[in-house]
């Protein structure tokens, strides 16, 4: 019965407006054809999880327990959660299994309650260093406690995505959103339990399978235009894409064509350090076949590594390349 009521309840759900908004900056989307939009529509947002079927949770029956190495356990219903001041944040999420140049990354507007506020009420032990989150479907993630309590990192128990209640496939009614960490250690959907513990006492779903425990997102950039093997018009040729360095921010994107000098691309406006940035380079290229590669530079001055690495165990690295023809 609860599952049957869930779709109707979601359609009728009214969530209070956020007390703090995060507006989309003018100029963030450069409007280049065939580049992923700066804000990813929910229907196009990547989905990676372990659920064999998407949970259909009755919002009236949903409950979150926060317990473990704390002074006070908390139990919250959905109305308890949304009665608190809600915070709106635009955050780019990425999957650790995303290959170089891959599309398992997206940027959305999330609204929710800062997890640090709930943890402050619960009072974590000084010995605790991890929060083990559990999904309705049994999935677990191990998130560094410091990432959830950091006042400069708005980790959320999110209840909306792009201004609407969370889609079922993206965690309705409540999910975690933690800037700067890969989803396998932070982005628990359909979350029902938060246990404050230690990394040496508990192990999560993917870390028990050999993936690293803390999961910071690696700086990445990709070429989206032109397509691999595609054709582009001369005068000048347009190369464009997206770059991200969550919780540090992108300062520059550079492109090299045919192993030539690195050229600085034009960047879209800055959202926050937790969002990706679009880039575009217009280059005068002779007709024929060309290969371009891209790299990013973060706000600390670190240049994206060229060293190739596979997604396992802590995320892919290397420069993305595209081969194309100028007509």
Please name every model-derived segment.
Residues 7-327:
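Structured, non-membrane catalytic/scaffold regions adjacent to prosthetic-group chemistry
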């Amino acid at each position: 019965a609860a599952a049957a009521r869930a779709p109707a309840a979601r359609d009728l759900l009214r969530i209070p407006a956020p007390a703090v908004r995060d507006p989309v900056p003018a100029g963030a989307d450069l409007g280049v054809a065939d580049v992923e939009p700066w804000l990813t529509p929910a229907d196009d947002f990547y989905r990676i999880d372990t659920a064999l079927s998407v949970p259909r949770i009755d919002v009236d029956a949903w409950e979150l327990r926060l317990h473990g190495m704390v002074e006070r356990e908390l139990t919250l219903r959905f109305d308890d959660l949304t009665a608190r001041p809600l915070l709106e944040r635009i955050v780019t999420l990425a999957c650790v299994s995303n290959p170089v140049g891959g599309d398992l990354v997206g940027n959305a507007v999330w609204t929710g309650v800062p997890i640090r506020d709930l943890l402050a009420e619960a009072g974590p032990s000084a010995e605790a260093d991890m929060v083990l989150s559990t999904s309705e479907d049994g999935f677990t993630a191990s998130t560094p406690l410091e990432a959830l309590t950091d006042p400069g990192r708005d980790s959320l128990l999110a209840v909306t995505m792009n201004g609407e209640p969370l889609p079922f496939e993206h965690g309705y009614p409540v999910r975690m959103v933690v800037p700067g960490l890969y989803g396998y250690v932070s982005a628990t959907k359909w979350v029902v339990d938060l246990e404050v513990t230690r990394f040496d006492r508990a192990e999560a779903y993917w870390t028990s399978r050999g993936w690293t425990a803390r999961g910071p997102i690696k700086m990445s950039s990709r070429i989206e235009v032109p397509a691999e093997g595609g054709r582009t018009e001369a005068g000048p040729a347009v190369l464009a894409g997206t770059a991200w360095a969550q919780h540090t921010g992108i300062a520059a994107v550079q492109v090299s064509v045919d192993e030539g000098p690195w050229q600085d691309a034009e960047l879209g406006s800055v959202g926050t350090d937790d969002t990706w940035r679009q880039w575009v380079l217009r280059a005068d290229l002779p007709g024929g076949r060309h290969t371009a590669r891209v790299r990013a530079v973060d706000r600390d001055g670190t240049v994206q590594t060229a060293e190739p690495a596979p997604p396992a165990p802590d995320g892919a690295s290397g420069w993305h390349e595209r081969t194309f023809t100028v007509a």
